[in-house]
Protein backbone atom coordinates (compact mmCIF):
# COMPACT_ATOMS: atom_id res chain seq x y z
CA UNK A 1 0.00 0.00 0.00
CA UNK A 2 1.00 3.66 -0.22
CA UNK A 3 1.47 3.83 3.54
CA UNK A 4 3.88 0.89 3.47
CA UNK A 5 5.91 2.72 0.81
CA UNK A 6 6.24 5.80 3.02
CA UNK A 7 3.53 8.03 1.54
CA UNK A 8 2.34 10.46 4.22
CA UNK A 9 -0.01 12.81 2.39
CA UNK A 10 -2.59 12.73 -0.37
CA UNK A 11 -4.29 15.34 -2.55
CA UNK A 12 -8.06 15.24 -2.89
CA UNK A 13 -8.85 18.04 -5.32
CA UNK A 14 -12.56 18.82 -5.77
CA UNK A 15 -11.93 22.19 -7.55
CA UNK A 16 -15.40 23.17 -6.32
CA UNK A 17 -18.23 21.55 -4.36
CA UNK A 18 -21.11 22.00 -6.81
CA UNK A 19 -22.04 19.14 -9.15
CA UNK A 20 -23.40 21.42 -11.89
CA UNK A 21 -20.07 23.24 -12.16
CA UNK A 22 -18.09 20.00 -12.07
CA UNK A 23 -20.15 18.71 -15.00
CA UNK A 24 -19.72 22.02 -16.82
CA UNK A 25 -15.92 21.78 -16.68
CA UNK A 26 -15.84 18.11 -17.60
CA UNK A 27 -14.74 16.64 -14.28
CA UNK A 28 -15.48 12.96 -13.82
CA UNK A 29 -16.15 13.10 -10.09
CA UNK A 30 -19.07 14.29 -8.00
CA UNK A 31 -19.30 16.15 -4.69
CA UNK A 32 -20.33 12.87 -3.09
CA UNK A 33 -17.22 11.15 -4.46
CA UNK A 34 -15.02 13.82 -2.89
CA UNK A 35 -16.70 13.64 0.50
CA UNK A 36 -16.70 9.83 0.64
CA UNK A 37 -13.00 9.70 -0.18
CA UNK A 38 -12.10 12.42 2.32
CA UNK A 39 -14.04 10.75 5.13
CA UNK A 40 -12.45 7.39 4.33
CA UNK A 41 -8.94 8.86 4.45
CA UNK A 42 -9.63 10.77 7.68
CA UNK A 43 -11.20 7.76 9.42
CA UNK A 44 -8.88 4.99 8.22
CA UNK A 45 -5.41 6.47 7.67
CA UNK A 46 -2.91 8.90 9.14
CA UNK A 47 -2.41 10.66 5.79
CA UNK A 48 -2.30 14.45 5.67
CA UNK A 49 -4.77 15.80 3.11
CA UNK A 50 -4.41 18.66 0.63
CA UNK A 51 -7.50 20.02 -1.13
CA UNK A 52 -7.45 22.32 -4.16
CA UNK A 53 -10.17 24.80 -5.08
CA UNK A 54 -10.41 27.11 -8.10
CA UNK A 55 -11.85 30.62 -8.09
CA UNK A 56 -13.32 31.80 -11.39
CA UNK A 57 -14.85 28.62 -12.83
CA UNK A 58 -17.77 28.93 -15.30
CA UNK A 59 -21.06 29.86 -13.61
CA UNK A 60 -19.31 30.12 -10.23
CA UNK A 61 -20.76 32.60 -7.74
CA UNK A 62 -19.71 33.97 -4.39
CA UNK A 63 -22.28 31.66 -2.80
CA UNK A 64 -20.39 28.74 -4.32
CA UNK A 65 -17.12 29.92 -2.81
CA UNK A 66 -18.84 30.29 0.55
CA UNK A 67 -20.05 26.67 0.25
CA UNK A 68 -16.51 25.56 -0.60
CA UNK A 69 -15.01 27.27 2.42
CA UNK A 70 -17.83 25.99 4.66
CA UNK A 71 -16.84 22.47 3.64
CA UNK A 72 -13.17 23.12 4.36
CA UNK A 73 -13.87 24.61 7.77
CA UNK A 74 -16.09 21.67 8.69
CA UNK A 75 -13.48 19.07 7.71
CA UNK A 76 -10.16 20.90 8.27
CA UNK A 77 -7.84 19.20 5.77
CA UNK A 78 -4.21 19.90 6.67
CA UNK A 79 -3.49 21.88 3.48
CA UNK A 80 -5.72 23.91 1.16
CA UNK A 81 -4.77 25.65 -2.07
CA UNK A 82 -6.94 28.32 -3.66
CA UNK A 83 -6.15 28.60 -7.35
CA UNK A 84 -7.22 31.36 -9.70
CA UNK A 85 -8.60 30.13 -13.02
CA UNK A 86 -5.95 30.22 -15.75
CA UNK A 87 -7.34 29.75 -19.26
CA UNK A 88 -4.44 28.09 -21.06
CA UNK A 89 -4.40 27.64 -24.83
CA UNK A 90 -5.37 24.10 -25.71
CA UNK A 91 -7.27 23.47 -22.48
CA UNK A 92 -10.95 22.39 -22.63
CA UNK A 93 -12.02 25.63 -20.95
CA UNK A 94 -10.10 27.93 -23.28
CA UNK A 95 -13.01 28.36 -25.71
CA UNK A 96 -15.24 29.49 -22.86
CA UNK A 97 -13.30 32.66 -22.14
CA UNK A 98 -15.43 34.76 -24.51
CA UNK A 99 -18.69 33.56 -22.96
CA UNK A 100 -20.65 35.28 -20.23
CA UNK A 101 -20.44 32.35 -17.81
CA UNK A 102 -16.83 33.07 -16.83
CA UNK A 103 -17.02 35.32 -13.72
CA UNK A 104 -15.82 38.90 -13.96
CA UNK A 105 -12.32 39.62 -12.67
CA UNK A 106 -13.54 41.69 -9.73
CA UNK A 107 -15.78 38.83 -8.58
CA UNK A 108 -12.89 36.36 -8.83
CA UNK A 109 -10.76 38.72 -6.72
CA UNK A 110 -13.54 38.85 -4.12
CA UNK A 111 -13.69 35.03 -4.07
CA UNK A 112 -9.95 34.78 -3.48
CA UNK A 113 -10.08 37.39 -0.72
CA UNK A 114 -13.04 35.67 0.92
CA UNK A 115 -11.22 32.32 0.84
CA UNK A 116 -8.19 33.93 2.47
CA UNK A 117 -10.28 35.47 5.25
CA UNK A 118 -12.21 32.27 5.99
CA UNK A 119 -9.11 30.07 6.04
CA UNK A 120 -7.14 32.40 8.28
CA UNK A 121 -10.10 32.66 10.66
CA UNK A 122 -10.11 28.84 10.82
CA UNK A 123 -6.43 28.76 11.81
CA UNK A 124 -4.76 28.32 8.43
CA UNK A 125 -1.72 30.36 7.41
CA UNK A 126 -0.46 31.02 3.86
CA UNK A 127 2.88 29.34 3.18
CA UNK A 128 3.48 29.37 -0.56
CA UNK A 129 2.38 31.41 -3.56
CA UNK A 130 2.90 31.24 -7.29
CA UNK A 131 1.53 32.79 -10.44
CA UNK A 132 0.85 31.49 -13.94
CA UNK A 133 0.20 33.03 -17.33
CA UNK A 134 -3.39 33.80 -18.29
CA UNK A 135 -4.61 33.95 -14.69
CA UNK A 136 -7.90 35.74 -14.20
CA UNK A 137 -7.38 39.26 -12.90
CA UNK A 138 -3.59 38.84 -12.63
CA UNK A 139 -4.15 37.08 -9.31
CA UNK A 140 -2.23 34.12 -7.86
CA UNK A 141 -2.44 30.62 -6.40
CA UNK A 142 -1.95 30.50 -2.62
CA UNK A 143 -1.34 27.45 -0.46
CA UNK A 144 -2.57 27.47 3.15
CA UNK A 145 -1.66 25.12 5.99
CA UNK A 146 -2.70 24.34 9.51
CA UNK A 147 0.09 24.97 12.07
CA UNK A 148 3.01 22.54 11.72
CA UNK A 149 1.37 20.79 8.73
CA UNK A 150 3.11 22.58 5.84
CA UNK A 151 4.05 20.42 2.87
CA UNK A 152 7.80 20.79 2.30
CA UNK A 153 7.37 19.37 -1.19
CA UNK A 154 5.30 22.39 -2.26
CA UNK A 155 7.93 24.80 -0.96
CA UNK A 156 10.71 22.91 -2.74
CA UNK A 157 8.71 22.90 -5.98
CA UNK A 158 8.39 26.69 -5.84
CA UNK A 159 12.15 26.97 -5.32
CA UNK A 160 12.93 24.59 -8.24
CA UNK A 161 14.69 22.20 -5.86
CA UNK A 162 12.38 19.16 -6.01
CA UNK A 163 12.51 16.05 -8.20
CA UNK A 164 9.22 14.72 -9.58
CA UNK A 165 8.50 11.23 -10.91
CA UNK A 166 5.32 11.19 -12.97
CA UNK A 167 3.47 8.36 -14.68
CA UNK A 168 1.01 8.11 -17.54
CA UNK A 169 0.45 9.71 -20.97
CA UNK A 170 1.32 13.41 -21.05
CA UNK A 171 3.15 13.31 -17.72
CA UNK A 172 6.41 15.13 -17.10
CA UNK A 173 9.19 14.03 -14.74
CA UNK A 174 12.00 16.22 -13.43
CA UNK A 175 15.23 15.27 -11.71
CA UNK A 176 17.13 17.72 -9.50
CA UNK A 177 20.56 17.14 -8.00
CA UNK A 178 22.11 19.15 -5.17
CA UNK A 179 24.12 21.22 -4.51
CA UNK A 180 23.91 22.99 -7.87
CA UNK A 181 20.34 21.77 -8.52
CA UNK A 182 20.95 20.82 -12.09
CA UNK A 183 17.79 19.48 -13.65
CA UNK A 184 16.79 17.07 -16.39
CA UNK A 185 13.27 16.48 -17.68
CA UNK A 186 11.47 13.61 -19.38
CA UNK A 187 8.10 14.07 -21.11
CA UNK A 188 5.82 11.13 -21.82
CA UNK A 189 3.83 11.11 -25.10
CA UNK A 190 0.30 12.47 -24.81
CA UNK A 191 -1.08 10.03 -27.36
CA UNK A 192 -2.14 6.85 -25.54
CA UNK A 193 -1.25 4.53 -28.44
CA UNK A 194 2.22 6.06 -28.80
CA UNK A 195 2.66 5.81 -25.03
CA UNK A 196 1.89 2.09 -25.03
CA UNK A 197 4.21 1.38 -27.94
CA UNK A 198 7.16 3.29 -26.46
CA UNK A 199 6.68 2.70 -22.74
CA UNK A 200 9.41 0.05 -22.36
CA UNK A 201 12.05 2.26 -23.97
CA UNK A 202 10.87 5.27 -21.96
CA UNK A 203 11.11 3.36 -18.68
CA UNK A 204 14.61 2.15 -19.56
CA UNK A 205 15.62 5.74 -20.23
CA UNK A 206 14.09 6.77 -16.90
CA UNK A 207 16.07 4.11 -15.07
CA UNK A 208 19.32 5.34 -16.64
CA UNK A 209 18.51 8.91 -15.61
CA UNK A 210 17.80 7.78 -12.04
CA UNK A 211 21.12 5.95 -11.92
CA UNK A 212 22.95 9.05 -13.16
CA UNK A 213 21.25 11.54 -10.85
CA UNK A 214 20.68 9.45 -7.74
CA UNK A 215 23.28 6.70 -8.07
CA UNK A 216 20.55 4.05 -7.98
CA UNK A 217 21.85 0.48 -8.34
Model feature map: region roles:
Residues 4-5, 64-66, 131-140, 178-182, ...:
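A broadly tuned preference for mixed-charge, low-complexity surface segments
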Residues 143-217:
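Radical SAM enzyme core and accessory elements
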Amino acid sequence: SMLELGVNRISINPQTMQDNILRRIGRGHSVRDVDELLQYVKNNTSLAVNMDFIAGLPNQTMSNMIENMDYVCQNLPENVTIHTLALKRGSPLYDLQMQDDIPEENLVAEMVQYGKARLEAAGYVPYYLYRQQYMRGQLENIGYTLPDKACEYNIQIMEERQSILSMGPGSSSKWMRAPEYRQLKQHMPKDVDVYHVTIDALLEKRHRICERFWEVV
